[in-house]
């Protein structure tokens, strides 16, 4: 079975590019330049009207992934909005000052997300024990881990990602993301089958980055080779 492509977007034009490029799934965000924050209600509503599954970034503030009880309540509200729009799922992560995943906080979010899909985002790449996090994510109840293997890009962390895939043993999806493009797909998929790949599929235009439907098509073509 061929791999599928999830595209992260933060605008209406990004939604349109995903439709035109035939993305398999969307990660819905705002402020991708900050690593992705919770999207607006407007973008969630528009996403609910298209025929592509969407997972919603639940990240109320920029910076690190350490959160307060006030943040937790805001994240609960954003999860409720995701559910109200009948979107596919949510994407979140949380860490402690000691560099470990905040399992207690994540458990609260997981419980509040009952009935929809849950992705552990790249907060997992900020902790020292990225590989060991696979078992933690499984036990917490995540469906997917988005990761670059603890490195800046998937190509740098590919060996770690393949070890994470072996650890997962089909119990959770390991979804490589960061720096994926049409040129490196074959190397990423050699020796390991990742069910999902994650990319912004963006190009530079007038001092900014935009989601590009042609790049989506090129990555999907490379996947099918």
PLM ranges: what are they?
Residues 3-7, 26-28, 47, 54-58, ...:
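Hydrophobic faces of well-ordered beta-strands that scaffold small-molecule active sites
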Residues 10-20, 66-79, 125-140, 161-166, ...:
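Catalytic cores of alpha/beta
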Residues 44-81:
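Structural motif corresponding to the early beta-alpha repeats
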